[in-house]
Amino acid sequence: MSENQGKWALILGASSGFGAATAREFARAGWNIIGVHLDRRGTMALVEEVINDIRAAGVEVVFHNVNAADEGKRKQIIAETVGLLRERGEEGRVVAMLHSLAFGAIRAYVDDGDGAITPANFQMTMEVMANSLVYWTQDLISSGLMTTGGRIYAMTSSGTHRVIRKYGAISMAKAALEANIRQLAVELATHGITANAIQAGVTDTPALRKIPDHPNMIGRILASNPHGRLTVPDDVAKVIVTLAVPATAWLTGDVIRVDGGEDIVG
C-alpha cells in the first residue's frame, strides 16, 4: 500500500501551467486530486488531457470548472468534498493545497494610451490572486478537511520586488499573497499546518504570455539564468510534491525560490 493512499491534494488553477504540472506530479506520487479551474469550451480539450493523465496514474480525480474566487462556488466545492471524503472514510485527508490562480489586471497605473488601471481592476486582482488563498484556507480548516500535517503552498513571483511593465497590480497582489502566507504560517502553527510561498522563475505559461513585455523577459532570462534555460512547470511541481511530507513540518512562512538561481543573478 502506498504511503500516500487516501491523501488528497487540492489544486486551485489545475488546468494549465504550475497547477496542471503539480496535479500530475501529485498523482504520480499516489495522491488523489481535487482540481479547480476556469476554462471555456476552447480550452476544455487541454483540461481533459490533465484529467486523463491523473486517472492514468491510478488515483481519484474530481475537477470543478468554476471561478475559484466566487464565494458560493467555493462553499459548494468544500461541502461536496466533505461529503465525498466522509463517504470514503477519509475525513481530514486534504493534506496539501496549491494556490495557483493567475488572473489579474495587466494595465498601466498611468494612462499610456490603453487606459489606466481602475479601482475595480485593483480589487479583482487582489481578491483572486491574494485574498482567495485566505478564504480557501479558512474553509479547509473550519470544515475539518485539512488537519495536522497539512501543507499549503501559493505561487508568487519576482514581481514582488521587480518592476515589470503593466504588472503593477499583480506585483501588489503577489506581495500581499506573501504577507498572507506569513500570517497563515504563524496562525496555523498550533494546528500543525505549514504555509509557504513558491517563487518560480520565468516560465513560458499562458499567464506569462499575457504580459506585454514577455518576449524581452524570456530573452533576458535565457541570457542570464545560470542553467541557460527558463524554468518549466515540472521543475516547480517536483519541488512542491517533494516538500509535501511530514519531515518538512519545521519549514513554514518562507518564500522558496525554484528558479535555477535566476533571481540571485539579477
Predicted regions and their residues:
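Catalytic loop of short-chain dehydrogenase/reductase
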Residues: 102-190, 202-203
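Short-chain dehydrogenase/reductase
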Residues: 2-96, 103-120, 210
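Aromatic pocket-lining residues of Rossmann-like dinucleotide-binding sites
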Residues: 26, 188, 243
